[in-house]
UniProtKB/Swiss-Prot annotation:
The keyword Ribonucleoprotein does not apply. Pfam families: Cry1Ac_D5, Cry1Ac_dom-VII, Endotoxin_C, Endotoxin_C2, Endotoxin_M, Endotoxin_N. GO terms for molecular function: signaling receptor binding; toxin activity. InterPro entries: Cry1Ac-like_dom-VII, Cry_V, Galactose-bd-like_sf, Pest_crys, Pest_crys_Cry1Aa_dom-IV, Pest_crys_dom-III, Pest_crys_dom_I, Pest_crys_N_sf. Toxic segment of the protein is located in the N-terminus. This is Pesticidal crystal protein Cry1Gb. GO terms for biological process: sporulation resulting in formation of a cellular spore; symbiont-mediated killing of host cell. Gene3D superfamilies: Galactose-binding domain-like (2.60.120.260), Pesticidal crystal protein, central domain (2.100.10.10), Pesticidal crystal protein, N-terminal domain (1.20.190.10). Promotes colloidosmotic lysis by binding to the midgut epithelial cells of lepidopteran larvae. Toxic to Pieris rapae. It comes from Bacillus thuringiensis subsp. wuhanensis. The gene is cry1Gb. Keywords: Sporulation, Toxin, Virulence. Transmembrane segments: none annotated. Belongs to the delta endotoxin family.
Length: 1169
């Protein structure tokens, strides 16, 4: 019998015409709304690759043809289901946004089409980029606004459609972005937004769907209607949202929706007979397919009707039927009817029912009693070819009104198949007044096919609920709403189930398996085919115990080892093991992926695998390549850490172990102590030593480990420095060593390697161009850690190098390397190698890390001869230095000894004054190589004898200060302890020498001094008088006993030591002296190389001027914290007088008559008894 198609929706070809006006009507029926939703779902299922065809499909189906009226009908559909009407203002806002989305999307797809026709045209690229950004901005801000507060449920279907549009748009940008001219960073950001949007949109839709379903707390027809219509309009879309992840699904993907929905109970419109639907909803179960209905006919009050039935079904791949218990009663008013679909493929289902319900409302024995009867007289079951299996009579209640076709042809465009039939009936205690026998039809989506066919050229997703057998301990549970159907669960280790699969490709085709799962524990998944083990791997937990299942709870993770099927019809089994009981493991589905497909994650894995392999000299990972740097290993570690746990957890762990092994090998060959900067100045003779302004920073997006920051300095005499000595015991004779590391940025950073000479390079590295983009904002992880996976790491595992002079190789501008050659080694001499980093400019700075000092290669040929020659020169110069040092040391020691009265060095000679101490100190400082000229805090070959004599000089200063009862007599502390009248100054003359300047005759400087009455004192003053008049230093008591020292410019005076000068030749002498003062007491030397600006020589050429006196041309004179004066300049006079106080207080007064009086020091010394 031919059944006329009663689906009066708009023809499919009209929907494909964006210029069609057919849908431009004021009101949509619920059937039309459902049809459009079903067509969109079909579009996604069948045409799910980015590009114009998919974009135009969305446009033609909905976004290009809907105006305010159509969107209003969409909103009205849900309003009627939940009995809530949106306010006119909110409705107007929502509709205007939807219309705006459509207009913006229209502009975008026009630009997309233009670009597809001319993909190399810069104008087309710019236009599609601009249109994409405009539409993306509109959806990014507009979709959340579709969830109108208080009306989230009423707007849920249009929210889902808007979300679907946004995901499609983002997927286009990720897929085409590189060809559009977007940067990789921009594409990665869009991909992150795509994944986050999938999660957020899914969770919103499922949340409010569940709220709406929960509000219908009584199982009644409205419950099933809500479930059906919101599943079609919202949940079916949501179940397909994950497929928009273009990096996970880069090729066509075949998905299946296994959820089950119900058409309304088969009752006449307006029927009021009471019945219960409480037991109609099926419990979660493995998916089954209807094979036969056995219907029993009863008779009630003269009406023959459907009184009961049995259902025979089968599961996918199952060879036997499942016969369900009897629903209703096995009445015998008529012979039993058997309703069986055709066995012909494609026709073995019912896509439509035409039912004949009957309702009678009859009076009883009195006016109060009425008998209401609701029954079904017959049903026509329609197959896709419109062939009919008839139970008694065909009716007019059409299931297509609720589950319409997806197009015109019932043969190819039906949307659902009849799956099962349950039975609703009146309560026994209500009969016979209310008598109802009502069948309830449940349906599954056409995408869920009776066979699990694995195609060779698509990703085949098979929900595990399509297994034909459950293993003990596995259960089917209701899906969380976003999986497209029910899911399987285990709470203890074991197999889930067996799934029959059909292979259409040659059996040589290889596949890989992925699993969409959620778990509260780390676990192992095992897979087998026909009992043969295929894969086994570890997978991480995805959620915490007690949490509700949400979109983010599920991960798609896979095995990387491909396999083949041995039979065209095979049994696939999956199990979960190695987790403790009472945890929960859920599986949504299994994915079979052609092995030839390359995913972004697999490309990353392959890249990481190559990078790891490139670290080692051989496949057994015994040795590390010499040119693999510490920084390199850290970046490879980042590559491995950024691999997805979902897809390659086992491989990630294996690669991670290999990288850790490489790191240990790197540490073993690194001769530096504490290369990771755990501390500076922690141990006196070990590790790093440095100036106090250096800071250790924790790892960031550039450095995985600690690194150091060196700031600039305001005085080049006091540079910022960091150094370490490589012990002689660690070095091999006649071997080249290399210092290398990574500099994030630097300015005026000087790097030294010192043994026989100084290898030196000044490095300026701008803070851009590193492997991690420094110009971008550093992304932050969820715990505040640097997110090293946020941007794509561009790294060449082949270490493409640009070499200099054929010997030295630097593969990135931020990498530095400096080598030094070692000749013979001597543990007694313990020369070692000094590693120094130094900054001596105000604008200088550096951030560096991953430092290594390692053996590079033995010296041969010319290099060997060169180092032997350099070593001989160094020894010759050292012998010469030793001879010179012996002479200088004897002279300096004689001068130092002369300061003291005995060899215990505990008393000064009576005539020892400050100038004599200064002169002795100068002789001590004539000892060369006390400290390295490159960095004066590092001791040189003569450090021991220098510090011996300098220590005695320090003692002399201390004894001198102790016996001088005048405080601050050298004015080093300014005018502290002095009383001042009038205007005077303390000036630093030529590198920190302080003098008192009395420029005016009315000025006076004085100090009260406590003395011992009856003892003798010597007043000693060193001063210079400039101009006319006299300078006077007076000592007196309160009333009498006054004496004074006078200084005049025009009287010839004896000047210590044995210098004389007159007023006529003073000026010439001053000019000759000007600028010769040196540092007196500033901690350490800054005696730097005079040729520090010369570019680094990367060949192994040695400096010929080793052991030259670096201080001769250097204004920063080393003194290790003690006094360092040159002899007094010509013109200064030292005078003294004896004084015997009679009281315990005296006054020292300094003044002049005219001109300027300059005082270097004032001493009041107690005479020896």
């Amino acid at each position: 019998m031919e059944i006329n198609n009663q689906n009066q929706c708009v023809p499919y070809n009209c929907l494909n015409n964006p210029e069609s006006e057919i849908l431009n009507v004021a009101i949509f029926s619920s059937e039309q709304v459902a049809e459009i939703h079903l067509k969109i779902t079909r579009l996604i299922l069948e045409n799910f690759l980015p590009g114009g065809s998919f974009a135009f499909g969305l446009f033609d189906l909905i976004w290009g043809i809907f105006n305010e009226d159509q969107w209003s009908a969409f909103l009205r559909q849900v309003e009627e289901l939940i009995n809530q009407r949106i306010t006119e203002f909110a409705r107007g806002q929502a509709i205007q946004r939807l219309v705006g989305f459509g207009r913006s999307y229209d502009e975008y797809i026009l630009a997309l089409k233009e670009w597809e026709n001319d993909p190399d045209n810069p104008a087309s690229k710019e236009r599609v980029r601009t249109r994409f950004r405009t539409t993306d901005d509109a959806l990014l801000t507009g979709v959340p606004l579709m969830a109108i507060p208080g009306f989230e449920l009423a707007t849920l279907s249009v929210y889902a459609q808007s979300a679907n549009l946004h995901l499609a748009l983002l997927r286009d940008a990720v897929f085409f972005g590189e060809r559009w001219g977007l940067t990789q960073t921009n594409i990665n950001d869009l991909y992150s937004r795509l994944k986050n949007s999938i999660r957020d949109y899914t969770n919103h839709c499922v949340r409010f769907y569940n709220i709406g379903l929960g509000n219908l707390n009584v199982i009644r027809p409205e419950y099933y209607r809500f479930q059906r219509e919101l599943t079609i309009s919202v949940l079916d879309l949501v179940a397909l949202f994950p497929n928009y992840d273009i990096r996970t699904y880069p090729i066509p993907t075949k998905s299946q929706l296994t959820r089950e929905i119900y058409t309304d109970p088969i009752i006449s419109p307006g029927a009021q007979a009471g019945y219960t639907l409480q037991d109609v909803l099926r419990e979660p179960h493995l998916m089954d397919f209807l094979n036969r209905l056995i219907i029993y006919t009863g008779e009630y009050r003269g009406i023959r009707h459907w009184a009961g039935h049995e259902v025979e079904s089968s599961r996918t791949g199952m060879m036997t039927n499942i016969r369900f218990p009897l629903y209703g009663t096995a009445a015998t008013a008529e012979p039993t009817r058997f309703i069986t679909p055709s066995t012909f493929p494609g026709l073995n289902l019912f896509y439509r029912t035409l039912s004949a319900p009957i309702f009678r409302d009859e009076p009883g024995a009195n006016i109060i009693i009425r008998y209401r009867t609701s029954l079904v007289e017959g049903v026509g079951f329609i197959q896709p070819n419109n062939g009919e299996q008839l139970y008694r009579v065909r009716g007019t209640l059409d299931s297509l009104d609720q589950l319409p076709l997806e197009g015109e042809s019932s043969l190819t465009e039906y949307s659902h198949r009849l799956c099962h039939v349950r039975f609703a009936q009146s309560l026994r205690n209500a009969e016979p007044l209310d008598y109802a026998r009502v069948p309830m039809f449940s349906w599954t989506h056409r995408s869920a096919t009776p066979t699990n066919t694995i195609d060779p050229d698509v990703i085949t997703q098979i929900p595990l609920v399509k297994a034909f057998n459950l293993h003990s301990g596995a259960t089917v549970v209701r899906g969380p709403g976003f999986t497209g159907g029910d899911i399987l669960r285990r709470t203890n280790a074991g197999n889930f189930g067996d799934m029959r699969v059909n292979i259409t490709a040659p059996l040589s085709q290889r596949y890989r398996v992925r699993i969409r799962y959620a778990s509260t524990a780390n676990l192992q998944f095992h897979t087998s085919i026909n009992g043969r083990a295929i894969n086994q791997a570890n997978f991480p937990a995805t959620m915490n115990s007690g949490e509700n299942l949400q979109s983010g709870s599920f991960r798609v993770a896979g095995f990387t080892t491909p396999f083949t099927f041995s039979d065209a019809l095979s049994t696939f089994t999956i199990g979960a093991f190695s987790f403790s009981s009472n945890n929960e493991v859920y599986i949504d589905g299994i994915e079979f992926v052609p092995a030839e497909v390359t995913f972004a994650t697999e490309s990353d894995q392959d890249r990481a695998q190559k990078a790891v392999n490139a670290l080692f000299t051989s496949s057994n990972q015994i040795g590390l390549k010499t040119d693999v740097t510490n920084y390199h290993i850290d970046q490879v570690s980042n590559l491995v850490e950024c691999l997805s746990d979902e897809f390659c957890l086992d491989e990630k762990r294996e690669l991670s172990e290999k990288v850790k092994h490489a790191k240990r090998l790197c540490d073993e060959r690194n001769l530096l102590q504490d290369p990771n900067f755990r501390g500076i100045n922690r141990e006196p003779d070990r590790g790093w030593r440095g100036s106090t302004d250096i800071t250790i920073q924790r790892g960031d997006d550039v450095f995985k480990e600690n690194y150091v920051t060196l700031p600039g300095t305001f005085d080049e005499c006091y540079p910022t420095y960091l150094y370490q000595k490589i012990d002689e015991s660690k070095l091999k004779a006649y071997t080249r060593y290399e210092l290398r590391g990574y500099i994030e940025d630097s300015q005026d950073l000087e790097i030294y390697l010192i043994r026989y000479n100084a290898k030196h390079e000044t490095v300026n590295v701008p803070g851009t161009g590193s492997l991690w983009p420094l110009s971008a904002q550093s992304p932050i992880g969820k715990c505040g850690e640097p997110n090293r996976c946020a941007t794509h790491l561009e790294w060449n595992p082949d270490l493409d190098c640009s070499c200099r002079d054929g010997e030295k190789c630097a593969h990135h501008s931020h990498h530095f390397s400096l080598d030094i050659d070692v000749g013979c080694t001597d543990l007694n001499e313990d020369l070692g190698v000094w590693v120094i980093f130094k900054i001596k400019t105000q604008d200088g700075h550096a951030r560096l890390g991953n430092l290594e000092f390692l053996e590079e290669k033995p010296l041969l040929g010319e290099a060997l001869a060169r180092v032997k020659r350099a070593e001989k020169k160094w020894r010759d110069k050292r012998e010469k230095l030793e001879l010179e040092t012996n002479i200088v040391y004897k002279e300096a020691k004689k001068s130092v000894d002369a300061l003291f009265v005995n060899s215990q060095y505990d008393r000064l000679q009576a005539d020892t004054n400050i100038a004599i101490i200064h002169a002795a100190d100068k002789r001590v400082h004539s000892i060369r190589e006390a400290y390295l000229p490159e960095l004066s805090v590092i001791p040189g070959v003569n450090a021991a004898i220098f510090e011996e004599l300098e220590g005695r000089i320090f003692t002399a200063y201390s004894l001198y200060d102790a016996r001088n009862v005048i405080k601050n007599g050298d004015f080093n502390n300014g005018l502290s302890c002095w009383n001042v009248k009038g205007h005077v100054d303390v000036e630093e003359q030529n590198n920190h020498r302080s003098v008192l300047v009395v420029p005016e005759w009315e000025a006076e400087v004085s100090q009260e001094v406590r003395v011992c009455p009856g003892r003798g004192y010597i007043l000693r003053v060193t001063a210079y008088k400039e101009g006319y008049g006299e300078g006077c230093v007076t000592i007196h008591e309160i009333e009498d006993n006054t004496d004074e020292l006078k200084f005049s410019n025009c009287v010839e005076e004896e000047i210590y030591p044995n210098n004389t000068v007159t007023c006529n030749d003073y000026t010439a002498t001053q000019e000759e002296y000007e600028g010769t003062y040196t540092s007196r007491n500033r901690g350490y030397d800054g005696a730097y190389e005079s040729n520090s600006s010369v570019p680094a020589d990367y060949a192994s050429a040695y400096e010929e001027k080793a052991y030259t006196d670096g201080r001769r041309d250097n204004t920063c004179e080393s003194n290790r914290g003690y006094g360092d004066y040159t002899p007094l300049p010509a013109g200064y006079v030292t005078k003294e007088l004896e004084y015997f106080p009679e009281t315990d207080k005296v006054w020292i007064e300094i003044g002049e008559t005219e001109g300027t009086f300059i005082v270097d020091s004032v001493e009041l010394l107690l005479m020896e008894e």
